[in-house]
């Protein structure tokens, strides 16, 4: 999976897909009451990127629904995964449950259209810290209460704050989540990051019977040398400001026979058995 990073403007979706991304990440900003308002990162962000692009969240969902709906004029077959970077650190932890309710309802109304949409992308909920786990509980409660629990099959969980992996496992146990879990490891593209935690996560992913990490991606990679390093370690995905660079690396002799781009037929919740 090649995740285009910080794709917050509607017009940038096609741009990142044209560069080779088959997944996009966008930031969701909330008001003080936990209501999702806009797709917006804000300052500071990655080196070499403008942080101010934005869109109204519901309008963004309306557009991305079309982009991921077969036979729609805007349909782009390659886009199979949407990563929602939830800016929960900007609101009180007490509002995390309200935020989860709101995002679930907006997805129901504007993306899935309560069963009337054929939009097919998988959804990855990126939670910054384990202390915000009530967002996940609320999201799942809302799908159940609204009568759409079946959409849980399309939704995965990911904690992005580089926290202790055992602490993350404990929270997933509290929530009763034993599948459909990604684990991110990374840092802003402005800095270098070691591989100790990434290697630990990969070891857990590959441990038989360990159900708290199904997939792993590294972020935010812009240097080809770091992309190569991550691929050698065996990541499932790379988040980048430059999807075209990832494409070029994947075509190199060392990787061409080992990796390919994920398609809709590849389940993002299953461990890869090579």
Curated annotation (Swiss-Prot):
Mg(2+) binds at residues 25, 27, 85. It comes from the Eukaryota. GO terms for molecular function: lyase activity; metal ion binding; phosphoric diester hydrolase activity; toxin activity. Its main location: secreted. Binds 1 Mg(2+) ion per subunit. One of its GO terms (cellular component) is extracellular region. Its EC number is 4.6.1.-. It catalyses: an N-(acyl)-sphingosylphosphocholine = an N-(acyl)-sphingosyl-1,3-cyclic phosphate + choline; an N-(acyl)-sphingosylphosphoethanolamine = an N-(acyl)-sphingosyl-1,3-cyclic phosphate + ethanolamine; a 1-acyl-sn-glycero-3-phosphocholine = a 1-acyl-sn-glycero-2,3-cyclic phosphate + choline; a 1-acyl-sn-glycero-3-phosphoethanolamine = a 1-acyl-sn-glycero-2,3-cyclic phosphate + ethanolamine. One of its GO terms (biological process) is lipid catabolic process. It is an enzyme of class 4 (lyase). Expressed by the venom gland. It is found in: Secreted. The active site is at 5, 41 (nucleophile). Belongs to the arthropod phospholipase D family. Class II subfamily. Dermonecrotic toxins cleave the phosphodiester linkage between the phosphate and headgroup of certain phospholipids (sphingolipid and lysolipid substrates), forming an alcohol (often choline) and a cyclic phosphate. This toxin acts on sphingomyelin (SM). It may also act on ceramide phosphoethanolamine (CPE), lysophosphatidylcholine (LPC) and lysophosphatidylethanolamine (LPE), but not on lysophosphatidylserine (LPS), and lysophosphatidylglycerol (LPG). It acts by transphosphatidylation, releasing exclusively cyclic phosphate products as second products. This is Dermonecrotic toxin SdSicTox-betaIIB1bx.
